[in-house]
């Protein structure tokens, strides 16, 4: 069997070799007006010299285009923390080494690390799946009638999205304004 440390080293070396491809893909993604972002914790063995047999929490940030773009892609960006500076650096926002910075719509959860992006010209677009999850948890754990009613609204919203998924952007927008807005206002 090949030692896990050897496999990890090989993966790291491959990552270094593939970095120009990842950079080109990220640059192409930043030409689109809408991106999705999320982050998830991963265990990371402490660097050489700091090893005491323990791991610490690092994060794998993911950025993807929407299903409506001609190029469907995901870029994963490993970071040693969950700090918002990582998403700002990926988007090339002021205060990072990249400029002038991306100015599209970012679909994300309500994690505070994204908030500085919205103060720097990025438009916040909340993720319906993350919002729905909170209401589902409220309903499932506490029998909340508010949570139950919200879930019924989400069923309606998802049905409208299914109807509109194959339409052109302007047609999707019109349907959303016509059918979704009244539900959101209810």
Residue ranges and their predicted role:
Residues 1-186:
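Catalytic center-proximal scaffold of phosphoryl-transfer enzymes
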